[in-house]
Amino acid sequence: LALKMTAENQAQAKELRRAMRSAYFKALQVFDALGDGQSDVFRLLSVVGAYSHEALRGSSVAFCRDNFVRQKAMEEIHKLRAQLSNVVQANLSGLSERQLRQLQNPSLPAPNAVQIKVLRQLLASIYIDRVAVRADIVGAPEAELAPAAQGTKMASTRRVPYVALGVPGPVYIHTSSTFYHRPPPEWLVFGEVYQSAPKDASLDNEEEKPRTIFLKMLTKINPAWIHTLGRSLCTFSQTTEEPGTSALSDSIKALKRGERSSLQRHVVITPRYGGSLQDGGAAGGQGWELPAFSAKQVLVNGRWSLQT
């Protein structure tokens, strides 16, 4: 009878864990909706915003319990937000009444589409030396580690190899990321590197099996941002005149007519990222090719220089 009760208890405990796990991932899906799941940071921002609304209603305890959030951590974040608002008000003069109301508002409204893009660019700027790219995009040898059955359409990032600046070997998206059950993005910035623990203990004379490296706190970025935000980490190709343009000839004619004081031309430049690093340079020091961009050059003292 005791054995039967133990078995029943174990089955009930297992069912309870399954239900809790299901509820946990459902809560994550709700918070992942902010920004269409383009950053793990947005998940945190969504939690903080939801907590601020519930705190005003006096239901913060229930919110934390139902959404698997630590109440003490949320209270500290809530207080820190208020402190930062006070610092901004004390150090920035000329704020409008609307801006002051926004800073003093304990509720945190959700960012709009434009603000979401600005936040992604801000995160890209912060982590510009922590860029990762899907291995197949840049033709890295690590791409061969991808499952053969995946083909060109990838439903999730599971076992999809990436290469990351300054991190040797293949890296993978961590299972806790909002990207894990989504199609794998091409370019990311990451906040943390996590190394898995070995599953089996190795003997003294046995070589330890290589550990899997995961990336956490990820944000999807546009590779066209990189050469602007991380210029010092990029190298640039020789300029080529933009095809199909007559800017130079038009500039010469305008110069002859006295309508312009300098010669100008439109060019195309191809940047490469990460190749200039002495340690851990991307693609063996060659860098990863980024999208080409158009620029305007001005002739100054006999030399063409980019117009900023």
Range-by-range predicted roles:
Residues L1-S246, D250:
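Second RecA-like catalytic domain
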Residues P109-Y127, A132-R134, Q150-K153, G244, ...:
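A positional "C-terminalness" feature that preferentially activates on distal terminal regions of long
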